[in-house]
Every structure is written in C-alpha cells, then in structure tokens.
Regions:
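PP2C/PPM-type serine/threonine phosphatase catalytic domain
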Residues: 1-281
Length: 281
C-alpha cells in the first residue's frame, strides 16, 4: 500500500489537533475535538497531547499484533493513554480531551476499516465509491447547532453559541443514545463503524478529517468521486488548498454556516499494489 498524506492546522493557529501515523500496512487518522475557551476539561493535558499519544499507541498496537481486531486495538490504545494521566487528571470528566478516529489496515486477503465519530473513509470499489462516515454527532444537540449556525462565524455571539453547543454535546458523549468518541473509556471502541472488504476489490482509499471533507459535505462544491480523483491526481495538499480557498470566500459563514471559519484539515490517500502507482515525476 502506497500512502500519501497532508495535514495542516487552521489558518491563524500554530497548533494542529489532527494526527496521522502510517506504515505500508496501517494508517491511523485522528481528529482531536476542539475545546472552546473557558470550558472546564478536568485534565491538565491538551487535545494535541491526547491525539499524539493515542496515535502512537494505535500504531504500536496495529504493527505489533497484525491480526488484532481494529476495535480491540483502539480499546487497548484508549486504555493505555488513560493510564498515562489517571493519577493527575479527572478521567470521567465529560469534557476531557477526545478524538475522532479513522483506521485502515491492509491484511493479506482483506482491507479492514474503522470509523469513530466525525471522520470519513472512502473506498474505491468495482461498484463505485463506498463512503463510511459516522454522523451520530450531528444527530444530537440539534437545537444548539441551529442556534450557532444563525450567527456570523467568529462573532462573539457565535462563540457563545459554540460553547453552548459543546456543553450540550458533552451530555451525550459516549452515551447509548448519543455519540461515541475516543477519550478515556475503552468501551467507545466497540461502538465504531467497522468492516472488511476483499483486498483485490479495493483500488484506492482515502481517510479524511471533517476539515478535509467540507468541499463535499458542507460546501457541496464537488462529489466524493471528484474529491478522491483530486487526491489521486494532485495530492492531499491540493485538496486542503482548495478547501482554504472556498472557506475564504465565506468568512462569516453566511453561505455555509459552520462551527469554525477554518478547521484543521488532514487527508490521506492509499493506493494498493494491485494497481500501478503513478511516478512522482
């Protein structure tokens, strides 16, 4: 499996809360949840710290134990990271650092995947593009989402509405009728979307944070097949560049209401060995 990726913090930010880790068999993509200023989190560590630790643990789990179920690997990684700060932080706090997760593994006969929270995986199969996306987060706190989207992105009122949204989301985090995300509870791993497809049926795959899917799901400028072709033709940085250009045409979110003017954006393209890999030249 040939892997190409790009990741970029939101313009104006020096901290990237996304994380990528990869080998020629395993790809890990994490999207850390942003925390509005002023909200308590019960933890001395940042979201960036959390995704860095979780990414490292996941890659170790998946490379050391190649036959391990992806859910088991994620559960073990969540437990391992929790143990790193169990003595210093309030692990049961609903606002503690958390992350959405996307995993892809090339096995001998299959390609295995896992999606937890708002990340997306695209699989290029003979029947077309399969889209695996966990939308449970969007199904809760609907009233708070709507209230935030009525305000100009970045305004003081928008910031207050965003904090209210996050406060409400915390009530539903890792709950049966809410949504699931990687944080301190290993059980969240077993609520991920998972699957396997025949190795020979996959030509390309993409793993995307929600900051890299905006051209399709938020802005509706292109469709998933076009996004995958853009990644393949011009590379992951080109996707992020086009996303930034679109964001800049609507800084206040009047055309495309959203929680943040810009978001951290990460995109990974995987090409499989059954298919010729274009030269870089």
């Amino acid at each position: 499996m040939h892997v190409a990726f790009a990741t970029q913090p939101a313009p104006g930010s020096t901290v990237n809360e996304d994380a990528i880790a990869a080998t020629d068999r395993v790809v890990v993509l994490l999207d850390g949840a942003s925390i509005p200023h002023g909200l308590e989190i019960g933890c001395r560590h940042s979201t960036a710290w959390y995704v860095a630790q979780l990414g490292t643990e996941l890659l170790e789990q998946l490379t050391d134990q190649r036959d391990q179920l992806l859910t088991d690997a994620l559960a073990s990684a969540i437990h391992a990271v929790a143990s790193l700060h169990a003595d210093t932080c309030q692990l049961d706090h609903p606002g503690g650092p958390s992350a959405a997760v996307a995993l892809l593994r090339e096995a001998d006969q299959t390609v295995d995947y896992l999606v937890l929270a708002d990340t997306t995986i695209l699989l290029d199969e003979p029947a077309g593009i399969q889209v695996i996306s966990d939308d449970r987060l969007a199904q809760v706190a609907v009233t708070e989402h709507s209230a935030m989207h009525r305000e100009a992105t970045g305004s003081l009122t928008h910031q207050r509405r965003y904090a209210e949204l996050v406060t409400e989301l915390r009530r539903h985090r890792n709950q049966a009728e809410g949504y699931w995300v990687a944080s301190s509870n290993p059980d969240a791993a077993y609520h991920a979307l998972t699957g396997s497809i025949r190795r020979l049926d996959v030509r390309r795959a993409a793993l995307l944070t929600d900051g890299a899917t905006r051209l399709v799901d938020r802005f509706q400028i292109m469709a998933w097949p076009h996004l995958l072709d853009l990644l393949d033709r011009e590379g992951p940085y080109a996707l992020i560049k086009q996303t930034r250009e679109a964001e800049s045409t609507d800084p206040e979110g009047r055309r495309w209401p959203r929680s943040k003017r810009h978001d951290d954006a990460s995109a990974i393209l995987c090409r499989f060995r059954c298919c010729p890999v274009p030269s870089d030249g």
